[in-house]
Amino acid sequence: MTHSLPKLDYANEALAPIMSAETLDLHHGKHHQTYITNLNNFIKDTNMANMSLEEIISESSKDKSKAGIFNNASQHWNHNLFWKCMKPNGGGQMPSKLEKLSLIHI
């Protein structure tokens, strides 16, 4: 299984002004892609080549000699979650109770 960069559910400029199109493109298209490229290179011709991302993370976490695999697989998973959590126009209004608590601690 070759791991690949996920398609975003929004355009590169959709997160501006919080994240510019240039920043998003660099982070998604270059930074995240590097983790995927490294991961695919690490697992090529190994027993992990046909595993899901979660299986690779689980298996590589058990062996210190597979730290490179673990790091790149974990960063790929983290970035997948990051992109899913982002959305145009933010997440809307923070619930008032949470907003009050956050203001107390800032």
List PLM regions with ranges.
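Divalent metal-coordination and catalytic microenvironments
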Residues: 5, 32, 76
